[in-house]
Design a protein with these regions (language model features):
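Secreted peptidase-domain scaffold signal
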Residues: 118-133
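Short capping/connector residues at structural and topological boundaries
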Residues: 33, 55, 114, 118-119
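N-terminal low-complexity, intrinsically disordered patches enriched in charged
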Residues: 26, 73, 119-121
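Hydrolase catalytic cores
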Residues: 3, 47-109, 113
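Residues at secondary-structure transition points
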Residues: 23, 38, 70, 116-118
Length: 133
């Protein structure tokens, strides 16, 4: 059975898998839970035929989780900037809950593709619930 390996298996981090524009897992994207059974990858992002800046400064297209991860990292950075009260664990929680496979995560797609608007709304609800206590 395949396992996600270090450093992607660390706790309290988001591990990002790569999908294509049809939402299909990329053949090069690691699969498998962690050695202690946690779901990894956490979520998926575009990593096949991703638009990147080429060596000539123009647009190029490339494949890899090395592209999926920074694409998703940028989205999460925007979410955290909008919701700076979130702890790391709360941030991961809203990302998981806002993903399309949240109800049935697996060791290929994790929690799936995240709807960042939904993640923002969940973060705002979490703040309202916390402020109301």
């Amino acid at each position: 059975m395949e396992k996600i390996t270090p450093p992607a298996d660390a706790e309290d981090i988001l591990t990002i898998g790569a999908i294509d524009n049809m939402g299909v897992n990329a053949a090069f994207s690691s699969i498998g839970n962690t050695a202690d059974g946690r779901i990894k990858p956490d979520v998926m992002a575009m990593g096949v035929h991703s638009a990147v800046i080429g060596v000539d400064g123009g647009t190029a297209f490339a494949n890899g989780t090395s592209f999926a991860s920074p694409i998703f990292c940028g989205l999460v950075a925007c979410l955290w900037q909008a919701c700076p009260w979130l702890t790391v664990r709360q941030l991961i929680q809203v990302v998981h809950e806002a993903s399309d496979r949240n109800a049935y995560p697996d060791n290929i797609y994790g929690y799936g593709v995240t709807d960042m608007w939904k993640a923002y709304q969940l973060a705002m609800k979490l703040k309202a619930d916390t402020d109301g206590k």
